[in-house]
Amino acid sequence: MAETYSTLAALFTDIADAIREKTGATATIVADDFPDVIRNVLQVKTYLTFSSPSSFTLKVNDTTKHWDGILEYSTDTSTWSTWDGTTTLSSATSRSDNVLYLRGTGNTVITGNGNKDSYKWVLTGSNITCIGNIENLLDYATVESGNHPTMADYCYYYMFYGCTGLTQAPALPATTLTTYCYSNMFYGCTALTHAPALPATTLATSCYQNMFRGCTSLTQAPALPATTLAPGCYT
């Protein structure tokens, strides 16, 4: 049954909480700003946003590029630089937060089939949210056009393994999955409090294997709408 509200204030408070949960923001939303805030939330973002109240860094565990196209990073969404995977990226201050933005072009895989967690990404910091559509790392122009980029096997394999400072996961909107694509993706993310929605209806071998293993702060599992399963998909 849909929730009812006794006052408009209660309704707007709930809407504000939902917006903050979606965007990762913490500031109070005043009534006059509601229309613009909602419009901004509804706009398609063509990048992935990492955000924290404190400074943080991001690197590839073995300082090697494993994506098969281009990844770019920015701290202001205006100036973008190519990331070759060999350097450590640092956040920059934006208002009350520290932020780092990433987007990709022509990628079908981000981490790939390494030796377990050898190709993982390492986030060093605390209270880090990852906001936006993960597919922006594959090809942001495809996402902007309303489509899903092609995803290869082992696409996000072990990507955030052991990232204990990650508190919010990105959206995972793909509806057709590939072998081991999300396997071990959030393994050991002990600060993760909510699992992202998993809308996929076409599964693949071991696609979700150990995806949330060791996520000790999760209290509720996501809905699993697929009606036809694949070998090891939920192991």
Question: Where in the sequence are the language-model features?
Answer:
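Extracellular ectodomain segments of secreted/surface proteins
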Residues: L42-H66, N136-Y140
